[in-house]
UniProtKB/Swiss-Prot annotation:
Keyword Iron-sulfur: yes
Organism field: Oryza sativa subsp. japonica
Name of the protein: Monothiol glutaredoxin-S3
Family label: Belongs to the glutaredoxin family. CC-type subfamily.
PROSITE patterns in the cross-refs: GLUTAREDOXIN_2 (PS51354)
Length: 136
């Protein structure tokens, strides 16, 4: 009985995390989703702060499934856009999803590596402006 109860509690916690991520991605221009205490999520946040954006940072438990959380957020975006296919610019591209997951303007950018690549290529600031994350 104890195992069934803890499994139910874990399922409820996972559903709560999915709801929280989905809501944040729908409402905030920039969202970083990472595990609690993740140093790479901290680096992503600092990079975005350095560009003038103020990202919402959601920390999830160690047992959280990155693919499920990202998929929940992307499904909400697809429903909002009125389509079933991945929106153009969603950085998943069928690749494995890992934390931290960075969303800008409701679209999945990818992880820290993709965020850094955008910054180094000069693509990050225009995307942040388009998402309404910068007031410049």
């Amino acid at each position: 009985m104890q195992g069934a109860r803890s499994a139910a509690a874990m399922a409820a916690a996972a559903a709560d995390e999915e709801r929280e991520v989905r809501r944040a991605v729908e409402e905030k221009p920039v969202v970083v989703v990472g595990r609690r205490g993740c140093c790479m999520a901290h680096v992503a946040r600092r990079l975005l702060l350095g560009q003038g954006a103020n990202p919402a940072v959601l920390e999830v438990g160690d047992d959280a499934d990155p693919a499920a959380l990202v998929d929940a957020a992307l499904q909400a975006r697809r429903r909002k856009d009125g389509g079933d296919k991945a929106a153009a610019g969603d950085g998943g591209g069928g690749a494995a999803v890992a934390f931290p997951a960075v969303f800008i303007g409701g679209r999945l950018v990818g992880g820290l590596d993709r965020l850094m690549a955008m910054h180094m290529a000069g693509e990050l600031v225009p995307v942040l402006k388009q998402a309404g994350a910068l007031w410049l």
